[in-house]
């Protein structure tokens, strides 16, 4: 077993992980702990924060400062954590499918993590908004379940990659994103971040948003509304004013 680094210690402390290691069997609980701790949010995009995606910078932003992030932050951080914990992982890129009306989103602007274990290869992702399986998804095609719905991977040639992540949240199987297994590097994540920050078709540079899964459901916030969805079906929606976003984010998400 590898000796636990300060980087891992800080991560484990932040998410409330009481073990001094993470095994493959631990990953469902570990990915839940990560998802419940770090919100999907875009303040850095709206503030035009200029930073490079490095292990040290993600450590500072997510563990020391009060930040969540988008896919390149959250899955970039997950990559470093899993690598440090002894897993064989690599960064990969995908293209989100925005629905039949809009088609494919900006090409190659979703970051995810490929993980190879003794019993097969998997996709792991804590940076796809609230669309999270909360466990490794087998590349071999088996379906996994989370409170959000069902997830599986299909090997299918598309114009955006040779695999697709499929989701069924109660309305039938739909494409979440297509991806390839070609390894990406930190420069690719920086490029992805620059596109998300500046491209006119980016969905994340128009207005503030935040979302996070919780043990009892999920929370979603825009500049005008804060909504709590509970797994039993109860919904609490409230209006927020100009200063309400930061206040609610600090109180409920961070």
Swiss-Prot record:
InterPro entries: Arylamine_N-AcTrfase, Arylamine_NAT_domain_sf, Papain-like_cys_pep_sf. It is an enzyme of class 2 (transferase). The keyword Acyltransferase applies. Its EC number is 2.3.1.-. The keyword Transferase applies. Keywords: Acyltransferase, Transferase. GO terms for molecular function: acetyltransferase activity. The active site is at residues 71, 110, 125. Belongs to the arylamine N-acetyltransferase family. This is Uncharacterized acetyltransferase YvcN.
